[in-house]
A protein has these predicted regions:
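Periplasmic peptidoglycan-binding/anchoring modules of Gram-negative envelope and division proteins
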Residues: 2, 7, 23-57, 82-86, ...
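Short beta-strand/turn micro-motifs at beta-sheet edges
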Residues: 3-4, 9-11, 109-110
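Generic low-polarity alpha-helical segments
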Residues: 5, 13, 17, 75-77
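Envelope-exposed proteins and targeting segments
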Residues: 11-13, 17-19, 26, 52, ...
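Short, functionally important structural connectors and interaction interfaces within domains
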Residues: 13-15, 22, 64, 106-107
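ATP/adenylate-binding site constellation spanning eukaryotic-like Ser/Thr protein kinases
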Residues: 20, 35, 77
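Second-shell loop/turn segments in exported
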Residues: 21-31, 63-70
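Periplasmic OmpA-like peptidoglycan-binding domain that tethers envelope proteins to the cell wall
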Residues: 59-128
């Protein structure tokens, strides 16, 4: 699915958004289909009465230079936050960052794995 929700210990919820749906290759411009994915994630956060801080963290695969991946992941996180922010309740704070190829969720040895690693993750604390 284009948005995967997973629970993490300590009352954290993480929603992974696939960068392949959000962006064209090597781009930080959100595609129309990507906008819909962000809208759905925002709706889900509002439904669960999000408050406090939402972290928006970009990740890439290990292709290309690490410096380029880090820069791209930061720009992508910022682009997602721009669309997400206005849809969230007043008082919710967005923090953006990019981790580049760090913290992969799958092996970068296969295209399928790299596809999973290209993502923007929303992390929320204290969501019901």
């Amino acid at each position: 699915s284009d948005a995967r929700r997973e629970r993490v210990s300590g009352g954290e919820t993480k929603i992974d958004l696939s960068a392949n749906v959000l962006f064209d290759k090597d781009s930080d411009v959100i595609k129309p289909a990507g906008g819909k994915v962000i809208d759905r994630a925002a709706h889900e956060l509002v439904e669960h009465k999000v408050s406090g801080t939402v972290s928006v963290i970009g990740y890439t695969d290990n292709l290309g230079s690490a410096a380029h991946g880090l820069d791209l992941s930061r720009r992508r996180a910022g682009a997602v936050a721009k669309v997400l922010g206005p849809q969230l309740p007043k008082g919710v704070r967005l923090v953006t960052d990019g981790k580049g190829e760090a913290d992969p969720v799958a092996s970068n040895d296969t295209e399928a794995g790299r596809r999973l690693n290209r993502r923007v993750t929303l992390t929320v604390k204290g969501v019901s």
